[in-house]
UniProtKB/Swiss-Prot annotation:
UniProt record similarity statement: Belongs to the phosphoglycerate kinase family.
EC numbers for this chain: 2.7.2.3
Name of the protein in question: Phosphoglycerate kinase
Organism annotation: Nitrosomonas europaea (strain ATCC 19718 / CIP 103999 / KCTC 2705 / NBRC 14298)
MF GO annotations: ADP binding; ATP binding; phosphoglycerate kinase activity
Amino acid sequence: MSVIKLVDLDLKNKRVFIRADLNVPVKDGKVTSDARITASMATINHCLKQGAKVMVTSHLGRPEEGVWTEENSLQPVADDIARRLGKPVRLIKDWVEGGFEVASGELVVLENCRINKGEKKNLEETAKKYASLCDVFVMDAFGTAHRAEASTHGIAKYAPIACAGILLTEELDALTKALHQPAHPLVAIVGGSKVSTKLTVLESLAEKVDQLVVGGGIANTFLKAAGNNIGKSLCEDELVPVAKSLMDKMNKRNATIPIAVDVVVGKKFAEDEAAVLKAANAVSDDDMIFDIGPESAQELVDIIMKAGTVVWNGPVGVFEFDQFGEGTRAIAKAIAETDAFTLAGGGDTIAAIQKYDIYDKVSYISTAGGAFLEFLEGKKLPAVEILELRAK
């Protein structure tokens, strides 16, 4: 993937506009989970060290266009970054028309870009105003790279130079390594509640991977396609034929979708529900499947341990409830121990990684949700595509 890289540029005294992903949860004016800020600091620090005049913006929440509210303000983010840098960081509220100065070696935070008129629609006029504020535009928000907006795509068209930040470069390198030059066997684990939301991902991966592990509600649709009774479990009946054809397609090229042989069931979705282990072909009509059993988990552990590359997106059970979390825990442990290149992404997956404390044992953790999935689908991400065009 040929894009201009931030680290190859001379930034001294240059006006640098960074689009980061600082969309973090905020409660009572304080950031409650700062992983995305931490991930963005490499690019910010690099620009400051080089003596650039640094501006950074991001979206936060879902503000109404043209309406500023305290709950969608980046002020808590600016405070968090100021604490990290050990110096004050100004928040510039109305910045689209310019009219503010930034000193060399200074960082300012530009208020939530989604408040700006024309941001979401990627209006040319808005994008040109953004571009006029900088000498160098840095795209560092992989999490929004699948959206063509004025701050992710439009500005990159018109800025004198448009490049990829350190985080974006790392994300693209890791994803490319996992999907375009993978060490085999290539294993993908796709969990989640619905086949429909991940159907295009499953179809795309079914052509590439050696083993496609399905988990969560998605797996129930495949269990049913394999002829099992799944009781009252979450399932999309209309997609059973699709699941069947994916299984056939993979079998034809000697690849597999492993189907659970044992499952953990309950009668209702509740934190105090008793977990009962059953063979996959012995599920009662009033059972709900909430996890895979130990035999199935062991099969997946063996697959992961023998893999060359593992891509993980989504848990395999209701891991929020400990009694239905053993399958996901076993997978997490195997991912931590395997010699394979491991890549994980998506909110629930990161929550599982944190719960089972394997954060530093995964080769690469993607901060993105939707963009991560679209890359897995083999889709072109508009914000990356424009950087490639600008590098020509």
